[in-house]
């Protein structure tokens, strides 16, 4: 087992159970991509077992802080099973949910979402890439499902020195799926949609917005950066008379319109604008248009620190 020795004073974050080891924290040592290494303090004290990534500024990601823990296939299988069992404790009003959330579940760089009878996984670190086959088999074993689609096409893969990969990892099936959540349904495309296909993390926000619309009797709603219309449908389900939805993606808007129709709403209750949000808002101001509620969830403007200044200007625009 190869050992990575940290610089003096760089052990504190690991001692607080932060799972990342940056390039600048390492005094000496190296390994192949995804290889399990021992992380020691400058004084030689064991800190963690981690997956090494020679191409990334996050040079290693911790698997375990227990010196007695073996990082092997059994460890991977147990971690996957534990994550999925944890979700079974919650009464989630949807057939779509996140089963594994990377570092939070002890599987750094792994994202797994479930859409009905289909799993979608993103492998975004060298460590989980190395254990991909074991992870795939463990996922099917733990869920009893047979279909697993890989969406390892995130830009973060390049930071790990990994190529983009997209396609069926286990089984075959349709990439156009139906997501059921709360009282509505939504079309989801797991091959070309954002993230693994949809923003499952906003499920409860959509329900809350629906409840607000009903309780506060929203008439006119504006949904900016609407993507495939999740909040548009939520507003209509809450009784909104009309929703204006703006996005710069034609395919996303087409799916948003399909989602409105899927839930039984007349097309005249929704307007879809293929346009720039900031420019549209300026036009609305000039026209004196107003809305009872506005959903404003812009995309990521600052992927790195280098983009921070430009992002700050964009948020104020």
PLM feature spans:
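Rossmann-like S-adenosyl-L-methionine
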Residues: 173-317
């Amino acid at each position: 087992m190869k050992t990575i020795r940290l610089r003096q004073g760089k052990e504190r974050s690991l001692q607080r159970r932060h799972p990342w080891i940056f390039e600048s924290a390492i005094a000496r040592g190296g390994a192949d991509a995804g290889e399990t290494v021992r992380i020691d303090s400058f004084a030689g004290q064991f800190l963690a077992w981690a997956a090494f990534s020679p191409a990334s500024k996050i040079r290693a990601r911790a698997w375990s802080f227990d010196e007695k823990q073996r990082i092997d296939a059994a460890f991977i299988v147990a971690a996957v099973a534990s994550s999925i069992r944890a979700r079974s404790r919650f009464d989630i009003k949807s057939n779509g949910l996140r089963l594994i959330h990377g570092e939070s579940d002890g599987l750094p760089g792994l994202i797994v979402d479930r859409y009905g009878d289909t799993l979608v996984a993103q492998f975004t670190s060298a460590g989980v890439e190395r254990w991909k086959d074991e992870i795939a088999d463990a996922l099917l074993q733990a869920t009893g499902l047979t279909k697993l689609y890989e969406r390892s096409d995130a830009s973060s893969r390049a930071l790990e020195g990994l190529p983009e990969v997209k396609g069926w990892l286990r089984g075959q099936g349709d990439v156009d799926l139906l997501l059921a959540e709360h009282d509505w349904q939504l079309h989801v495309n797991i091959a070309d949609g954002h993230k693994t296909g949809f923003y499952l993390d906003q499920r409860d926000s959509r329900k809350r917005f629906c409840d607000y619309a009903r309780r506060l009797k929203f008439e006119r709603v504006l949904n900016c950066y609407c993507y495939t219309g999740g909040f548009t449908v939520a507003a209509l389900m809450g009784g909104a008379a009309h929703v204006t939805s703006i996005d710069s993606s034609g395919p996303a808007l087409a799916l948003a319109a399909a989602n409105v129709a899927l839930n039984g709403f007349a097309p005249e209750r929704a307007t879809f604008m293929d346009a720039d949000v900031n420019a549209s808002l300026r036009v609305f101001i000039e026209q004196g248009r107003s809305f009872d509620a506005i959903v404003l969830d812009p995309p990521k403007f600052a992927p790195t620190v280098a983009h921070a200044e430009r992002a700050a200007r964009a948020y104020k625009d």
